[in-house]
Amino acid sequence: MYADGVPKSMEGGRSENDVSLWSFCRFRDCVECCVCGNRNGAEERKENKMKVLMINGSPNENGCTNTALEIIGKTLAEEQVDSEIFQIGRNCVKGCIGCGACSKEHRCIFDGGVVNEILDKMENSDGLIIGSPVYFASPSGTLVSALDRIFMAGDKFYLKPAAAIATARRAGMTPTVDVVNRYFACVGMPTVPGNYYNMIFGRTPQELLQDEEGVQTMRTLGRNMAWMLKCIEAGKNAGIDAPAAEKKIKMTFIRQA
């Protein structure tokens, strides 16, 4: 090792950028890291891969929304980030009844459905992407019912990067994305951009793939998500702690006389 701790295998042609990348690596104790071409610690790196949960709010398993999420998933894989598509599908999802029981256990009292399953998956996920087709200029009703309960009960969302995408034949995607983004804002999740609004057009998966700009936006979103996850991980390894969440202050705008 060098005096500054950089592996000797980096001498002779290794750029300053390689050394910089190595300095943030969480596997520095393997001495010969992936930056310098060695595969020591590869199994450990594989086990510690970052993961993004992608929720498909469409009732159609292989429709346009799934196709858009698959484009993102392929890009994430190219960036060494795992992903999983969870389809809410045609399940009957109850809406939130506002009982408040989830505040204690951070699980929905209506067990046995997709809501608690998603909450369990979020515990082991580093990022979240939610996709929906447009239903009357809003997300699908099933998705909204699920999200109301998920974000009311969940406590594993704070500072995890998130993004919303929408698919449509023609219009209504802007308010659809806006509805989903508001869930992220309420629990302190930073939102990840593409290179334009996270929307893609098509009535069928085949038509969707013809929207070259939309496809590019999905790819860019995948790369940006991977980059943000890596930046957060690099910050942790550099000793930069995430800001602690303050205890929530809840007020009403109605003042008693």
What feature does the model see in each segment?
Residues 111, 190-257:
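Glycine-rich phosphate/pyrophosphate-binding loop and the adjoining helix
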Residues 51-79:
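N-terminal beta1-alpha1 ligand-phosphate binding loop
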Residues 2-4, 15-18, 40:
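Acidic/polar hotspots within intrinsically disordered regions
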Residues 25, 30-33, 91-122, 250-255:
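Cysteine-cluster motifs in flexible loop/terminal segments that predominantly coordinate metals
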Residues 105-196:
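Helix-loop-strand module that forms the ligand-binding subsite of alpha/beta enzymes
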Residues 37-49:
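Short, Lys/Arg-enriched N-terminal segments with co-localized hydrophobic residues
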Residues 82-91:
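A short beta-strand-loop structural module common to alpha/beta enzyme folds
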